[in-house]
Amino acid sequence: MRVVVGSLNPTKIEGVRRAFNQFFDDVIVKGVEVNSGVGNQPFNNDVVKGAINRAINSFQDCDFSVGIEAGLFSLKKTLTGYIDFQVAAIYNGKRITIGFGPGFEYPPVVLSLIHI
């Protein structure tokens, strides 16, 4: 099985390799550079859009492609008003599935460095 990750980030590639190896044998995973179509620090729906774009744009000579994007989501009643979530999109050439990783809140001092 061939899997392409829409990123050259070694941590993302290794994470995808480990995940697919839990369910399939003989998995070959490679990363490619693609355009996410969103900013460097995506917000809200752009985080999901970036993951989907990465998955679709990296689908080439493979069984599955994976797009991973992280970014801030507005969430009321939190200290800063934002939670960072990671989004993964898996594409088989016909259908996309989406999953979210655990969210966390940046300390206010870190969030103050991000232009929201």
Feature roles, as predicted:
Residues 97-109:
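Activity-critical C-terminal alpha-helical subdomain
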Residues 114-116:
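Conserved small/polar residues in nucleotide/adenosyl-binding loops
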